[in-house]
């Protein structure tokens, strides 16, 4: 029988159907149409440990709750912010720390979060920046009084909006914005002050998968302490000291 920490052979294993959206470098397609990215690698590694075969399904992020409720997916695993909505799902332990940040054009006069007052900002709909800037984030903070909050179903439209000058700023996960900035024809810079510091986890429907959550948490703990998580985030150019969760501090 398999000992804890050993990886299962990917033969006749039960599927874990994972809902994702395109969110490079976390989840995206390679040239052959395969799902790749930080969260994909982590999910595949965890599933090998706990005895599941991962099946990644792209979902409309704004419809994620409905898809989960209908049973079309087992969980949502795509850099999903748990901060402020801890009671809406059954969550795993957090596996990564993330900053929600704001990016502006390099020559913009905007230098801080306070400077966003009376400005136009773009976000992906149903994300944490959408919740924060619309005042429904579930966390206490002073929200800028925007001229407009423009919500897009696809993150690529958000970037197109700032490129074309339709908005003054965009907000999202720092690692996602930085990935876009690598290839953007328009030079952007990230404001030094974070919009919100958050943690991400894997979300399941309440009271449906307690044993799976327990086993994923055990795998997270193992991968943190054997160095896998640090090596994984480092391979994406991220500092493990900033991104890897210290589980001792979460207890």
Region roles according to the model:
Residues 63-66, 79-88, 132-135, 160-197:
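A ligand-binding cleft/hinge motif common to bilobed small-molecule-binding domains
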Residues 40-49, 107-110, 114-128, 178, ...:
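Extended ligand-binding regions for polar small-molecule ligands
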Residues 13-37:
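Short glycine-rich His-centered loop
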Residues 44, 48, 53-115, 189-194:
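Acidic, polar ligand-binding/catalytic clefts
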Residues 20-22, 97-104, 178, 182-221, ...:
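Periplasmic-binding protein-like
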Residues 28-31, 43-52, 129-152, 180-185, ...:
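Ligand-binding cleft/hinge of the Venus flytrap
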Residues 52, 60, 92-145, 149, ...:
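A conserved helix-loop-strand patch within extracytoplasmic ligand-binding domains
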Residues 40, 55-66, 147-164, 198:
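Short helix-initiation/N-cap motifs at beta->coil->alpha
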